[in-house]
Amino acid sequence: MAEPGHSHHLSARVRGRTERRIPRLWRLLLWAGTAFQVTQGTGPELHACKESEYHYEYTACDSTGSRWRVAVPHTPGLCTSLPDPIKGTECSFSCNAGEFLDMKDQSCKPCAEGRYSLGTGIRFDEWDELPHGFASLSANMELDDSAAESTGNCTSSKWVPRGDYIASNTDECTATLMYAVNLKQSGTVNFEYYYPDSSIIFEFFVQNDQCQPNADDSRWMKTTEKGWEFHSVELNRGNNVLYWRTTAFSVWTKVPKPVLVRNIAITGVAYTSECFPCKPGTYADKQGSSFCKLCPANSYSNKGETSCHQCDPDKYSEKGSSSCNVRPACTDKDYFYTHTACDANGETQLMYKWAKPKICSEDLEGAVKLPASGVKTHCPPCNPGFFKTNNSTCQPCPYGSYSNGSDCTRCPAGTEPAVGFEYKWWNTLPTNMETTVLSGINFEYKGMTGWEVAGDHIYTAAGASDNDFMILTLVVPGFRPPQSVMADTENKEVARITFVFETLCSVNCELYFMVGVNSRTNTPVETWKGSKGKQSYTYIIEENTTTSFTWAFQRTTFHEASRKYTNDVAKIYSINVTNVMNGVASYCRPCALEASDVGSSCTSCPAGYYIDRDSGTCHSCPTNTILKAHQPYGVQACVPCGPGTKNNKIHSLCYNDCTFSRNTPTRTFNYNFSALANTVTLAGGPSFTSKGLKYFHHFTLSLCGNQGRKMSVCTDNVTDLRIPEGESGFSKSITAYVCQAVIIPPEVTGYKAGVSSQPVSLADRLIGVTTDMTLDGITSPAELFHLESLGIPDVIFFYRSNDVTQSCSSGRSTTIRVRCSPQKTVPGSLLLPGTCSDGTCDGCNFHFLWESAAACPLCSVADYHAIVSSCVAGIQKTTYVWREPKLCSGGISLPEQRVTICKTIDFWLKVGISAGTCTAILLTVLTCYFWKKNQKLEYKYSKLVMNATLKDCDLPAADSCAIMEGEDVEDDLIFTSKKSLFGKIKSFTSKRTPDGFDSVPLKTSSGGLDMDL
């Protein structure tokens, strides 16, 4: 699509050529008419032109800078005898502001009363409709052809005239307001703008007649601090196209406030041949005016007036009105109550006042009267830290003392004042607070009181209209946090503000709480819509600098000047700010004592040390505990760290050093997540607004390590898009363990980088690391992700954020499931829940799954086994391999292969066969031997039995057997007890006679002496 300014540039050039041709065309027509009259002498005779029938114009400037003044009839052909052309003024000639060029005598004359001029300029201050020459265009940010359909959704997203100003769009479309002008000399363009919301990109730039933009130093507009601001840019001679362009980047439910522009003035244009009448509601009471004044309240004026007219008594008008309105009857919505300051008697008066400006009438039927004032009541006590003087005013107690609102008391020895501001009694507005009213119609401050004191609370008074912003501001010069807090670079809390409030509304009222740092634009922190019961809100302050806190209440957003809902109010009961520099104290807190020559004095404990209340000495917190730095009293101030975490050196936070252990009945699993310590990013699926703008939720995560330092950074660069590469600019950023931002990619925006906006912290502190699904009230449902299939439970990191919102009363929480996935190399992959593509299903609890091989347990001896090879060539190898599937990472390495000397199976086979053969032979020999031996013994035994039966023998019984044939006389037969095999062998070898026969001893049955036969 062509650049919008290009077509306007062309039209400007065409218009310039047309302007140069006009005088020549008129002269040609006049010459043709005269010639026609001469040739047609019989035609009707034309009268001489009167001054009212023609006007003067200049011809185009020639190369020498000269031009001619010519008379041009209003209607060609009606008259004749026009004045002859004469030499005109120099092309560079111009009149001053408040003057116009009288073309008759070519001199500057002052404007008459009721009129004004800018000299060589033009002004646009009426925006009931788009002025002539302006163009309003809209486009979708998508640059590709796929956005053609969504572009149609942006046709109505344009700049809208609203009477005194023109307002930009508030959606994600790009709206452009353009004006083309041809300058005869160098000039300026200046305008007023109201730019309160940084979620809109607002740029103003100028293109010259070569369609080249001028210097970009003033292109990107800065947000306005208070009300309207003035902006001016120099213009070069020639064609200039002015662009006011806005694009909103608020893709959530919050609708940003539009950019407003008014009073556009351009100088350096062609001469002004007449003065402009003052618009209704303004006047010029003297000649030579360069601007018109506004009519005061209760007066009006018509167009071109020299003075304003007073309204009738029964009518009223606001400042700059063109008419008067009838005063309505006064109601109870037209007045409010307040309290006077305490008098010398310690009493205050209840006062009723009409809301300003008073537009109602007390004389009409049914009108209410202002209630009687002057009822006296006793003054409430002073606020804590203040004391009451003799004239019943409240003054702050000196440093080193405290009070509950009565008398000041010195802090006891061993204590120090806890300085701050605690406002809970509202008899007068504190000196460091101010209140005003910002008009919801023209966004100008009215110098009125927006909040009124009412004893035990402060509330919103009645404004000029229901859409006015009732503003209350508290300014704190700085903070004085404890020394232990200042030493902790990761703990961002330097102080906190707590206030109790309620809203009572019948329509769509809104209460805004905003914070400004170093006088920068107030940033909305929280918004409450509709009626809210009495409740408390706490905001943590993270920067030690001058800070302003602002409460703004708007009864309705309807763009009308009416006062119908003044009974809709916001009330603030108390405001408490801690650790305020030069503040006051309502109590004294224990401190560490330091001995000196003059006694003992308070000193600060080192970081990570608590104060013993009894002795005033400093003691280090135990291991694995952190110190509550803002209340470091007693050992109970040391809070234990969660599972899987430990404290840092100064006991300010608990962190995980990227290690974890899980015990089971059979073994201990150790983890090391060091490979996952670096920050990683993850983008959710694309989302689209109602206008078709594509955006992503972009997450940045830092899991562990780094001594607990938060490494994830999310930024808001909406107002910093045009900073050149290599240069730094201001952009809001937050640091956390896990943060989220809304990203519009560069291919959509067309800028050098994608737009990052609305950064949010999701994890400010680590609660613990465990395999349990619930910890400290935070649950990580397993069903949000695909189930684990390896039998190794997920290790879950639990975090909490410090941000507390209406929808997340306990703050946001984040869980990161770290799952062992051996096939995914480092760093692995991050996943969002399948059912909640933005990481959360409720907006408060965010869940992530991180799968990686680095999430597996460390390898140990239980994760591998040995494989022994066969013996080859006398060598045997033992190889160690991982068990499959391998479910570990890192840890120990596999042992080296082990080589041993061995015997082959052939050798052992030969040895076995040889041993078997020998054994068989030996057994055979022994068997034969014993068989033969047994045969001999059997034979001898049978002989003895036979001899024992010979009872009829004549000879006396012999003690030995007879010598048989073939037997040796020397053989002895002895009956012995049973012998073993080896005993028999021994006997055999020892009794063998030299002749080869055995000697067997015999034993008689009577046990007598052995006898040799």
Swiss-Prot record:
Changing S829R: In a breast cancer sample; somatic mutation. Residues 42-910 are extracellular. It comes from the Eukaryota. Expressed in normal endometrium but overexpressed in endometroid tumors. GO terms for molecular function: RNA binding. Its main location: membrane. Residues 932-1013 are cytoplasmic. Glycans are attached at N153, N404, N672. The chain crosses the membrane at residues 911-931. One of its GO terms (cellular component) is lysosomal membrane. The keyword Signal applies. It is a single-pass type I membrane protein; Single-pass membrane protein. SMART domains: Ephrin_rec_like. Disulfide bonds join C278-C295, C308-C330, C311-C342, C658-C704, C714-C739, C808-C844, C820-C856. InterPro entries: Elapor1-like_3rd, Elapor1/2, Elapor1/2_C, Elapor1/2_GBD, Elapor1/2_MRH, Elapor1/2_TNFR-like, Growth_fac_rcpt_cys_sf, Man6P_isomerase_rcpt-bd_dom_sf. GO terms for biological process: autophagosome assembly; cellular response to starvation; positive regulation of autophagosome assembly; positive regulation of vacuole organization. It holds the Pfam family ELAPOR1_C. Keywords: Autophagy, Cell membrane, Disulfide bond, Endoplasmic reticulum, Endosome, Glycoprotein, Golgi apparatus, Lysosome, Membrane, Signal, Transmembrane, Transmembrane helix. Induction: By estrogen replacement therapy. Residues 1-41 form the signal peptide. Belongs to the ELAPOR family. May protect cells from cell death by inducing cytosolic vacuolization and up-regulating the autophagy pathway. May play a role in apoptosis and cell proliferation through its interaction with HSPA5. This is Endosome/lysosome-associated apoptosis and autophagy regulator 1. The gene is ELAPOR1.
